[in-house]
């Protein structure tokens, strides 16, 4: 599948998505979500969970780069957005530097093009002109966000910011030239609906893929 700038294997969902994995404890939802995230080829995962750091194997398999343990922190969603926005800023920085670098090299190899002295200083190091670098080689990073063990937390009971994130997840980290980085959200929950402290209707309505195991409900 191809969605925007992202490709996923034929048997995998398209990016970006909101995935709900629903099943009681020990049902296999963690294994299913881990396998799906690995299959889809994300560059790294942002984990939102008070228990994630205790599972090193999980952290290694999911290439977890950031962990938010305090699921009652009102600035949690803002922190996630900043990570993605910083990726957008860094990609724009790289693309701008690469454009200037190419112009500089053309000017150096030309007899008539003017040379920008600022760029001459910026790119010269170690007796050579160094090409700009970017962590993801000039492409948009593929980012997954995994929510686990958040039942009853302020993140779920005061969901205004989380609702907004689930609604515009594809548009987080907007780029000046158009498009955005975007993120895929994965929620691991024990019940699709619950009396209090679970995922609300707004997020459930944003669901694009559902992994459903046997639950306690008939």
Where are these regions (language model features)?
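An amphipathic, basic-hydrophobic helix/alpha-beta surface used to engage anionic
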Residues: 45
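Conserved NTP-binding/hydrolysis module of P-loop NTPases
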Residues: 58-99
């Amino acid at each position: 599948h191809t969605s925007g700038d992202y490709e996923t294997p034929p048997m995998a969902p398209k990016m970006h998505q909101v995935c709900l994995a629903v099943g009681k404890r020990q049902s296999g939802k963690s294994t299913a979500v881990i396998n799906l995230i690995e299959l889809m080829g994300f560059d790294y995962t942002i984990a939102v969970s008070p228990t994630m750091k205790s599972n090193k194997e999980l952290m290694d398999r999911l290439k977890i780069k950031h962990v938010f343990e305090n699921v009652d922190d009102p600035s949690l969603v803002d922190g996630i957005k900043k990570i993605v926005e910083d990726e957008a800023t860094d990609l724009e920085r790289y693309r701008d530097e690469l454009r200037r670098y190419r112009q500089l090299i053309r000017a150096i190899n030309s007899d008539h093009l003017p040379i920008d002295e600022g760029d001459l200083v910026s790119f010269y190091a170690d007796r050579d002109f160094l090409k700009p670098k970017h962590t993801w080689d000039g492409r948009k990073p593929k980012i997954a966000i995994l929510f686990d063990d958040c039942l009853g937390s302020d993140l779920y009971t005061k969901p205004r910011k989380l609702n907004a994130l689930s609604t515009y997840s594809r548009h987080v980290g907007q780029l000046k030239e158009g498009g955005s980085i975007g993120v895929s959200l994965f929620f691991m929950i024990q019940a699709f609906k619950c009396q209090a402290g679970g995922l609300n209707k707004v997020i459930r309505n944003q669901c694009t893929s559902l992994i459903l195991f046997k639950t306690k409900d008939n």
